[in-house]
Amino acid sequence: MVREKVTVSTRTLQWKCVESRTDSKRLYYGRFILSPLMKGQADTIGIAMRRALLGEIEGTCITRVKSEKVPHEYSTITGIQESVHEILMNLKEIVLRSNLYGTSEASICVKGPGYVTAQDIILPPYVEIVDNTQHIASLTEPIDFCIGLQIERNRGYLIKTPHNFQDGSYPIDAVFMPVRNANHSIHSYGNGNEKQEILFIEIWTNGSLTPKEALHDASRNLIDLFIPFLHMEEDNLYLQDNQHTVPLSPFTFHDKLAKLIKNKKKIALKSIFIDQSELSSRIYNCLKMSNIYTLLDLLNNSQEDLMKIEHFRSEDIKQILDILEKYFVIDLAKNKF
C-alpha cells in the first residue's frame, strides 16, 4: 500500500483542496485538508462540518406536479409508458441549480410520440437544469403531455401530506440536500506535546454546486449559528417572571412508540444519515461503531439489538424515538423500536 503524502503548513492554520474531480453531471467530488490543528480540534470541526454539509445547505427541487387530467397518483394514462407515480419519481430526481427564494412555477408541454426529458422543462431564468438528459416520460402516441410544476428552494426534507388533492396537484417528497455525502478523517503527526492533527474532509455533491462551494456555504452557516453568542448580553442570560418558558409534556415510551407505528410514511431511508438528526455525540458514536449510518440501518435493528450495543441505554432509545417523531413519520415494523 502506497502512503499518500500531502504538504501542510507548520504554523498558520490553512485549508486547501488536494483532489477535485467530476465523475458525472450529477456527481462531483472534492477532498480538502485543514491544518495544523491541536489535538481534539480536528474531530470537533469535522463533526460540525459534516452535519452542516448534509443538513444546512439549501437546494432546489420540484415539490408539486399539477395536471387536471390525472385521476390519482397510481393511475396510468393512455399513450404514456410510465405510470403517474413513476413520472413523479422521475421528476423527484431532477437536479436543479438556482438563486430562488421560496417557490416558483415551471411547466412541461410536449407532443408525442417521443421522450420527455429534463430539457423540456420550461423554467424561470434564475433556475437551471444540471443534467438535461434526465428521463421523465416516454410518449408512445401523438398525445399532448402538459403539466405544471412547483419549484422550491429549501433545506433538509419535505415529506408530502397523505391526503388527496382535489385540484389535480400531486406533492412530491423532496430531498433538498445538494451534498450527497460527506466524510471526515484525521491524521496525527508529531510527538508528545508537539502532536498536531490534519483534518481531511471529503464531499460528494449532486452537481448543483461544487464541493468547494458546499464547503464555503457550510462554513458560513456555522459562523452564522455562532455569531449570536458573540453579542449575548448579560440581561438575556436568565428568564425572569416565567417569561418565554415552554411547558414540557412528560415522556411516555409506549405512547411515543404507538404514535410512530400509527403514522405511516414512505421516505428515502437510505438517503437520511443518522448524524443529520439531533442525536448526541455519544449515541451517534455508538451507532457508528455498530455500522449504523443511515435511518434504514437504524430501523433494521430491534430495540433488543440496540440494547446489545456497548454503552447503549434505554434512555438513548427514547431519545431516538423522540427525534423520529419530531422530524419523520415512519412506518415501523412490529418488534422494531
Swiss-Prot record:
Gene3D superfamilies given in the database record: 5' to 3' exonuclease, C-terminal subdomain, DNA-directed RNA polymerase, insert domain, RNA polymerase, RBP11-like subunit
Superkingdom of the organism of origin: Eukaryota
InterPro entries on file: DNA-dir_RNA_pol_insert, DNA-dir_RNA_pol_RpoA/D/Rpb3, DNA-dir_RpoA, RBP11-like, RNAP_asu_C, RNApol_insert_sf
Catalyzed reactions per annotation: RNA(n) + a ribonucleoside 5'-triphosphate = RNA(n+1) + diphosphate
GO CC, alphabetical: chloroplast; DNA-directed RNA polymerase complex; mitochondrion
Cysteine pairings via disulfide bonds: none
Record region (Alpha C-terminal domain (alpha-CTD)): 265-337
Subunit comment: In plastids the minimal PEP RNA polymerase catalytic core is composed of four subunits: alpha, beta, beta', and beta''. When a (nuclear-encoded) sigma factor is associated with the core the holoenzyme is formed, which can initiate transcription.
Reported function: DNA-dependent RNA polymerase catalyzes the transcription of DNA into RNA using the four ribonucleoside triphosphates as substrates.
Domain characteristics, as noted in the entry: The N-terminal domain is essential for RNAP assembly and basal transcription, whereas the C-terminal domain is involved in interaction with transcriptional regulators and with upstream promoter elements.
UniProt family annotation: Belongs to the RNA polymerase alpha chain family.
Descriptive protein name: DNA-directed RNA polymerase subunit alpha
The species this protein was found in: Solanum lycopersicum (Tomato)
Gene this protein is translated from: rpoA
